[in-house]
Design a protein with these regions (language model features):
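Residues within the helices of the helix-turn-helix
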Residues: 7, 18, 47
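DNA major-groove recognition helix of helix-turn-helix/homeodomain DNA-binding modules
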Residues: 44-59
């Protein structure tokens, strides 16, 4: 999974990966591994990221479930 959209959203909200990790209750290292595709986000983490980054429900697939072509 490519999370460039999610990284862009983090930056657009004026946050760092460390800020986001703290707000969703995981370590910055864990968030970085997930953003690089080494491990998957849990449903709870996706929900929390959407809350923290103000991602509307209709846009969730674009951030978390976009298929690779």
């Amino acid at each position: 999974m490519n999370y460039l959209n999610l990284l862009g959203r983090i930056r657009a909200r004026g946050m760092t990966q460390s800020d986001v990790a703290q707000k969703i209750g995981i370590s910055p290292t864990t968030l970085n591994k997930k953003l690089r595709g080494h491990t998957d986000f849990t449903q709870t983490e996706i929900r929390d990221l959407c809350r923290v980054l103000a991602i509307p429900d209709a846009e969730i697939p674009a951030y978390f479930f976009a298929a690779k072509l």
